[in-house]
């Protein structure tokens, strides 16, 4: 799975994914701002209610016929985004993965998208870690008990289960790191974190508050939301903006310090295979810089893109994953 990464044999980023010189907004016309449906990128969508709770999570899936002898990728979006920020990455992985050994699931975190919980405003890291571990394990149970996947208690059958790789961007990266450190996810194999590092995240919290204060709380139309995302450089890929920005309300968002505290140490302590994807070396803090030089995790840099790497340059995360 990670062999190509460790051999350093990855191809270069597709230059067509990055716009140089004239801004993307200047290149687009009014007719270019339109929305597309999630079903152009995913196989299906459904809601999963966790047993014993009032929490119902919206999930999007691809390659749902993969139930054993392969990998299960679970994607967690960043704060203020939804599962659909992974649309292009999931679609490109599906089209590249001709042998269909990879199943993919994205879910809307609480307080985001179409997920409904008993307390949507509770975005504490402890709560979101509980959500992550409980949902992934329950989702695996659904695969093995209802969809004919590998299951049972004997060791041979256990080996047939899908190996779980959790992928998180920004806030989602914090959640997957801290969930991984609890050892609560069954069959966890890999951990991929996109553009979140403890040191730089904590330093950026004060400036992030002022940025969020200028962010519109709502838009008159989806078209206006897409226009704003491009003109503000929030998203640098019009194709991704068309599918990920399907809503016009509830754009308010905030950050909590506990998302990032202790992040570097917990990332390094995880027993899973670890990959960190960043938009630049300036995002590395001291602890991770030293650990990377010691070979404790794999680092991939994708320059020339913004914070939302999986939307700006979907070919980058797709190739690395």
Swiss-Prot record:
Catalytic activity, as annotated: [phosphatase 2A protein]-C-terminal L-leucine methyl ester + H2O = [phosphatase 2A protein]-C-terminal L-leucine + methanol + H(+)
Intrachain disulfide bonds: none
One Gene Ontology term of the molecular function aspect: protein C-terminal methylesterase activity
Domain of life: Eukaryota
UniProt keyword terms in alphabetical order: Hydrolase, Serine esterase
A Pfam short name: Abhydrolase_6
InterPro entries: AB_hydrolase_1 (IPR000073), AB_hydrolase_fold (IPR029058), PPase_methylesterase_euk (IPR016812)
Catalytic site: 170, 195, 307
GO biological process per UniProt: protein demethylation
EC number(s) from the headed UniProt entry: 3.1.1.89
Family according to the record: Belongs to the AB hydrolase superfamily.
PANTHER family documented for this protein: PROTEIN PHOSPHATASE METHYLESTERASE 1 (PTHR14189:SF0), PROTEIN PHOSPHATASE METHYLESTERASE-1 RELATED (PTHR14189)
Role this protein plays: Demethylates proteins that have been reversibly carboxymethylated.
Protein name, as recorded: Probable protein phosphatase methylesterase 1
Source organism (scientific name): Dictyostelium discoideum (Social amoeba)
Lineage: Eukaryota, Amoebozoa, Evosea, Eumycetozoa, Dictyostelia
